[in-house]
């Protein structure tokens, strides 16, 4: 269901107009951010998500809805409703762990995603990194950051190994173990890109876990494991800069100390690796 109203509504207006029998439920943090909430009617729950990034165009939020609309139930929650500034999606009952699932299980889930039809829009990291630079706190801009950004832009993004629909925010809190298996939530960064970029961006604990995931995925996809790992490593500098820039971006938006701590730690990692 999609509304044609062009003026963003408040949460209370959304509830009274489109979900009159629903009320806000107990807040939950998994996969929710920026004013999103769970609403409930008796035992039925729905996730109401708000477009919370003031620097992102409305088209990006609509892409999020469209991605969910075309994905199968074996991968993601169903998209239920859209109006400018808001969407409602299925609430997935299950268990959310901060740790990633077993490498074989996660590889199978990602391979299943990458076998789906493409979304129709490409993920382009270079303009995204430039946006993070321009939108961050000016006091946080450093010569080191600018040098790394210019070097990546000069080199250009790696040539894709295989193009596929990507989730691009795979970590434990965005994976729900339902009665029917693993599902991914929080698809706001989804788009088409290199499968190795997806694997490079997974929030792993260390290189050992990363290699286990890469090897398991190579077995699923019948790709040479060494070739896949080389491609993942080509994307690694881009992903680290992406994470650092995103932390800076969120720090400027929210002022939350967790983001500045994460940004500082990511910059330390980059400097240690030269």
From Swiss-Prot:
On whether Aminoacyl-tRNA synthetase is a keyword of this UniProt record, the answer is no
What pairs make up the disulfide bonds?
Answer: none
Sorted alphabetically, the keyword list is: ATP-binding, Kinase, Nucleotide-binding, Transferase
Does the keyword Nucleotide-binding belong to this entry?
yes
- State the pathway, as annotated in the record: Cofactor biosynthesis; thiamine diphosphate biosynthesis; thiamine phosphate from thiamine: step 1/1
Q: What Pfam families has UniProt attached to this entry?
A: APH
UniProt catalytic activity:
thiamine + ATP = thiamine phosphate + ADP + H(+)
Example of a GO biological process term? thiamine diphosphate biosynthetic process
Under Enzyme Commission nomenclature, its number is 2.7.1.89
- Drop me one GO molecular function for this one: ATP binding
The similarity comment for this entry is: Belongs to the thiamine kinase family.
NCBIfam families reported in the protein's UniProt record: PRK10271.1, ycfN_thiK
Free-text function comment from the UniProt entry? Catalyzes the ATP-dependent phosphorylation of thiamine to thiamine phosphate. Is involved in thiamine salvage.
Q: What is this protein called?
A: Thiamine kinase
Per the UniProt record, the lineage of the source organism begins with:
Bacteria, Pseudomonadati, Pseudomonadota, Gammaproteobacteria, Enterobacterales
User: What gene name does this entry carry?
Assistant: thiK
């Amino acid at each position: 269901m999609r509304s044609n109203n062009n003026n963003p509504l408040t949460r209370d207006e959304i509830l009274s107009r489109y979900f009159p029998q629903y009320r806000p439920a107990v807040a939950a943090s998994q996969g929710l951010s920026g004013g999103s909430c769970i609403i409930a009617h008796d035992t039925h729950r729905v996730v109401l998500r708000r477009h919370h990034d003031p620097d992102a165009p409305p088209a990006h939020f609509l892409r999020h809805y469209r991605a969910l609309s075309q994905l199968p139930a074996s991968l993601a929650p169903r998209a239920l409703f859209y109006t400018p500034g808001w969407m409602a999606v299925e609430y997935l009952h299950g268990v959310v762990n901060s740790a990633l699932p077993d490498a074989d299980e996660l590889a199978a889930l990602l391979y299943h995603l990458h076998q789906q039809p493409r979304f129709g829009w490409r993920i382009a990291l270079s303009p995204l990194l430039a946006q993070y630079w321009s939108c961050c706190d000016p006091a946080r801009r450093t010569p080191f950051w600018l040098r790394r950004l210019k070097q990546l832009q000069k080199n250009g993004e790696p040539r894709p190994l295989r193009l596929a629909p990507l989730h691009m925010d795979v970590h434990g809190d965005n994976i729900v173990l339902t009665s029917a298996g693993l599902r991914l939530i929080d698809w706001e960064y989804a788009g088409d890109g290199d499968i190795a970029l997806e694997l490079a961006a997974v929030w792993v604990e260390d290189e050992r876990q990363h290699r286990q995931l890469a090897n398991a995925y190579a077995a699923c996809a019948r790709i040479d494991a060494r070739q896949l790992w080389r491609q993942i490593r080509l994307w690694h500098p881009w992903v680290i800069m992406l994470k650092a820039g995103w932390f800076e971006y969120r720090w400027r938006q929210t002022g939350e100390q967790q983001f500045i701590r994460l940004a500082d730690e990511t910059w330390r990692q980059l400097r240690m690796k030269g």
